[in-house]
């Protein structure tokens, strides 16, 4: 159950922002294997003075169209899977909405089931971790 935080320069259209969000989600479904309905994303638009980055870090020329993506997800995936996810996100963003691969900056932050509460202050994912029990959330009373 990942959550993706996406930062980009203010002024992009709603369709552009949605295409970025869709590309990230579709890559997670395809490469990580999350269910299609497991979608939690935050898009933050920033003015140029609040989006600070090195335009040539490690020799990669970045433009004003940089997209910074931080994905928090449960740990344990192989290095190959993580690298494949980076590549697939960059490829999908290049395809639609046309983000240059040089402008795609991704960081994965891994954690544990105990770090997630998906509603009502409950942590049902811990049951899976602690007891191997199926994950379900009881109806609200």
Language model: regions and residue ranges:
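Interaction-mediating elements
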Residues: 1-141
């Amino acid at each position: 159950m990942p959550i993706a935080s996406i930062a980009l320069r203010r002024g992009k259209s709603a369709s552009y922002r949605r295409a970025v969000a869709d590309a990230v989600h579709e890559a997670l479904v395809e490469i990580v294997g999350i269910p299609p309905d497991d979608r939690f994303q935050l898009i933050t638009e920033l003015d140029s003075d609040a989006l600070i980055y090195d335009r040539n870090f490690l020799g990669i020329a970045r433009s004003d169209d940089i997209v910074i993506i931080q994905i928090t997800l449960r740990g344990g995936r192989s290095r190959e899977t993580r690298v494949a996810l980076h590549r697939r996100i960059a490829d999908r963003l290049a395809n639609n909405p046309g983000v240059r691969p040089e402008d795609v900056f991704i960081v994965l932050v891994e954690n544990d089931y105990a770090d997630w509460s998906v509603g009502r202050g409950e942590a049902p994912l811990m049951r899976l971790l602690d007891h191997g029990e199926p994950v379900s959330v009881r109806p609200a009373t």
